[in-house]
């Protein structure tokens, strides 16, 4: 994209925009929740729809002049239904967290009970952490992964549900490298007459492509964000059975949002259309294959992976067994200096602060978008290990940085 007009109007902002484009082009994005959208999605998100207020839903707006807003939203809805096989879809949430809020407001009362995965075990803030709205409005208890295996303790979850009697059980996670057994979680919900919300923010694209089990038709509600593995730009989405449609729509608007961001809805429509193409399934499978290769190479270097590997787009490394004196934050900062951007992350049984934890999380969605295959990801694992093993060695960091420069030149991104 050209920023010539921005530069004429505001050189300082143009400098930041061009700097960010250069940063993305010249570094390897391995934060598991990040990806690179197409130029078409970015064009849609910077369209004249940014000017349009469209409170309400297609055919039922509170303002005039919404015919094209209706067209775009209906395209996004229809394409989402085709991608995920959902009965009802709301594409207006501004984010995945807003989508979760829409479900909570739609079917819960303040003080109702939520059972969700502990944040340090791979859950998400919006699933009921005390710092988040969900933890402040609802009564929340959290289930765990088995610290020995790294897998969700489904039996423990079932027992916890029977004891706590939640109104809703949340599945779907932000740092869990294994396939989620939505059927088993639904069984736990059925046993206590609870709703089941499956938050697939991280795996929307994997589910759409059929390379991960789908919760659609299993869970009562499915939420997600649209900028991770689905590559449809920033935003959220809610899917549900038709019986819940009115409650969910009312909880989004007017319950928790005003006018939708129609330029972002346009980006969703374009991204969903791209995901309906046959090559998207190949992309999703390659993303998983790349993560598996990345994890296997880490293990060759003696690093400890939570759960021993991955079934999806991310790997979670516990540094304590191999590098007990090194924190995830040290590694994150050294890798960023070398041009590899991932994040420090808590791990099951965490003993350090969440701001300086014992693990690192690495994802392959953005690398795969650039064209990386398994061999390239194995080399990236080698580079990461060099920095893990010597995060304060300037020569090592410089050596890795030089190789990253070569790789970003080979696997180009935005012109």
UniProtKB/Swiss-Prot annotation:
EC code: 2.1.2.1
Gene designation: glyA
Main localization (coarse): cytoplasm
Pathway the protein contributes to: One-carbon metabolism; tetrahydrofolate interconversion; Amino-acid biosynthesis; glycine biosynthesis; glycine from L-serine: step 1/1
UniProt protein name: Serine hydroxymethyltransferase
Similarity remark: Belongs to the SHMT family.
SUPFAM superfamilies per UniProt: PLP-dependent transferases (SSF53383)
Keyword Transferase: yes
A GO cellular-component term linked to this record: cytoplasm
Subcellular location: Cytoplasm
Cofactors named for this entry: pyridoxal 5'-phosphate
Residues recorded as bearing N6-(pyridoxal phosphate)lysine in the entry: 228
A GO biological-process term: tetrahydrofolate interconversion
CDD domains: SHMT (cd00378)
Site (Plays an important role in substrate specificity): 227
Record's keyword annotation contains Signal: no
Binding site for (6S)-5,6,7,8-tetrahydrofolate: 119, 123-125, 353-355
Subunit structure: Homodimer.
GO MF entries: glycine hydroxymethyltransferase activity; pyridoxal phosphate binding
Alphabetic keyword roster: Amino-acid biosynthesis, Cytoplasm, One-carbon metabolism, Pyridoxal phosphate, Transferase
Signal peptide as annotated in the record: none
Catalytic activity, as annotated: (6R)-5,10-methylene-5,6,7,8-tetrahydrofolate + glycine + H2O = (6S)-5,6,7,8-tetrahydrofolate + L-serine
Role description: Catalyzes the reversible interconversion of serine and glycine with tetrahydrofolate (THF) serving as the one-carbon carrier. Also exhibits THF-independent aldolase activity toward beta-hydroxyamino acids, producing glycine and aldehydes, via a retro-aldol mechanism.
UniProt xrefs under InterPro entries: PyrdxlP-dep_Trfase, PyrdxlP-dep_Trfase_major, PyrdxlP-dep_Trfase_small, Ser_HO-MeTrfase, Ser_HO-MeTrfase-like, Ser_HO-MeTrfase_PLP_BS, SHMT-like_dom
Domain of life: Archaea
């Amino acid at each position: 994209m050209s920023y010539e007009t921005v530069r004429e109007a505001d050189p300082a902002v143009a400098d930041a925009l061009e700097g960010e484009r250069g940063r993305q082009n010249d570094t390897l994005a391995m934060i598991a929740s990040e990806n690179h959208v197409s130029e078409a999605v970015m064009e849609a998100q910077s369209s004249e729809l940014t000017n349009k207020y469209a409170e309400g839903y297609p055919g039922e707006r509170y303002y005039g002049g919404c015919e094209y807003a209706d067209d775009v939203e209906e395209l996004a809805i229809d394409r989402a239904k085709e991608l995920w096989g959902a009965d009802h879809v709301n594409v207006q949430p501004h984010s995945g967290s807003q989508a979760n809020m829409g479900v909570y407001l739609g079917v819960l009362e303040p003080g109702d009970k939520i059972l969700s995965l502990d944040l340090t075990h791979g859950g998400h803030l919006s699933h009921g952490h005390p710092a988040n709205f969900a933890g402040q409005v609802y009564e929340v208890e959290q289930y765990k992964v088995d610290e020995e295996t790294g897998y969700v303790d489904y039996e423990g979850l079932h027992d916890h549900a029977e004891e706590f009697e939640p109104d809703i059980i949340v599945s779907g996670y932000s740092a869990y490298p294994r396939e989620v057994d939505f059927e088993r979680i639904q069984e736990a919900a059925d046993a206590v007459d609870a709703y089941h919300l499956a938050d697939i923010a991280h795996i929307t694209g994997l589910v759409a492509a059929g390379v991960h089990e789908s919760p659609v038709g299993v869970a009562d509600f499915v939420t997600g964000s649209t900028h991770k593995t689905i590559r449809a730009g920033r935003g959220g989405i809610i899917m549900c059975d038709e019986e819940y449609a009115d409650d969910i729509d009312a909880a989004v608007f007017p319950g928790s949002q005003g006018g939708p961001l129609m330029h972002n809805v346009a980006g969703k429509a374009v991204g969903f259309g791209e995901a309906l193409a046959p090559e998207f399934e190949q992309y999703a499978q390659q993303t998983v294959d790349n993560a598996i290769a990345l994890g296997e190479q880490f293990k060759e270097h003696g690093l400890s992976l939570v759960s021993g590997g991955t079934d999806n787009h991310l790997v979670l490394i516990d540094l304590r067994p191999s590098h007990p004196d090194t924190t995830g934050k040290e590694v994150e900062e050294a890798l960023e200096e070398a041009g590899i951007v991932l994040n420090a992350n808590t791990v099951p049984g965490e003993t350090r602060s969440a701001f300086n934890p014992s693990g690192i999380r690495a994802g392959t969605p953005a690398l795969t978008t650039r064209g990386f295959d398994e061999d390239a990801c194995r080399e990236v694992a080698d580079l990461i290990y060099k920095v893990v093993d010597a995060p304060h060695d300037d020569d090592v960091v410089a050596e890795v940085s030089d190789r990253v420069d070569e790789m970003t030149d080979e696997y180009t991104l935005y012109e």
